[in-house]
């Protein structure tokens, strides 16, 4: 769920999840146009990951994970929860690995500036 995703973002980036709300064209919704930078591309890939889970509820299904030796370990009983956790883990790692591309000018980015068809997943 968004709760666990938020915790992962804090643990891996030391940024508040609010830093990524309405960032670029893909973080926090929108999902149109082209990613503005590598940080926004992380969110694009995350959206694609969620698209592979049509029978799950990634924004509301709560799952369990461990934070062990600086690593996220997904531990869930159901396939949906495990896969949601893996999608969220991947985006949190991607955001951490691309912290150097984070640009404040893309925070609360106006959605109308996101034009064109998005890349294919």
UniProtKB/Swiss-Prot annotation:
Expressed by the venom gland. Disulfide bonds join 25-114, 27-43, 42-94, 48-121, 49-87, 56-80, 74-85. Gene3D superfamilies: Phospholipase A2 domain. GO terms for molecular function: calcium ion binding; calcium-dependent phospholipase A2 activity; phospholipid binding; toxin activity. InterPro entries: PLipase_A2, PLipase_A2_Asp_AS, PLipase_A2_dom, PLipase_A2_dom_sf, PLipase_A2_His_AS. Pfam families: Phospholip_A2_1. It comes from the Eukaryota. It is found in: Secreted. Its main location: secreted. GO terms for cellular component: extracellular region. GO terms for biological process: arachidonate secretion; lipid catabolic process; negative regulation of T cell proliferation; phospholipid metabolic process. Keywords: Disulfide bond, Myotoxin, Secreted, Toxin. Residues 104-116 are annotated as: Important for membrane-damaging activities in eukaryotes and bacteria. Negative results: does not show antimicrobial activity against E.coli and S.aureus and does not produce appreciable hemolysis on human erythrocytes. Monomer. Snake venom phospholipase A2 homolog that lacks enzymatic activity. Shows high myotoxin activities and displays edema-inducing activities. Has cytotoxic activities against HUVEC cells (LC(50)=2.5 uL) and human lung adenocarcinoma A549 cells (LC(50)=2.9 uL). Belongs to the phospholipase A2 family. Group II subfamily. S49 sub-subfamily. This is Phospholipase A2 homolog EPL_00195. It comes from Echis pyramidum leakeyi (Leakey's carpet viper).
């Amino acid at each position: 769920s968004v709760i666990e995703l938020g915790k992962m973002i804090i643990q891996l980036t030391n940024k508040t999840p609010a830093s990524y709300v309405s960032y670029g064209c893909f973080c926090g919704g929108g999902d149109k146009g082209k990613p503005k930078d590598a940080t926004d591309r992380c969110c694009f890939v995350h959206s694609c990951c969620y698209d592979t889970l049509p029978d799950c509820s990634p924004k509301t299904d709560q799952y369990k994970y461990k934070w062990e030796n600086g690593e996220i370990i997904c531990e869930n009983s159901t396939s949906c929860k495990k896969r949601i956790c893996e999608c969220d883990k991947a985006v949190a790692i991607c955001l951490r690995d691309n912290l150097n591309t984070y640009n404040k000018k893309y925070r609360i980015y106006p959605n109308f500036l996101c034009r064109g068809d998005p890349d294919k997943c």
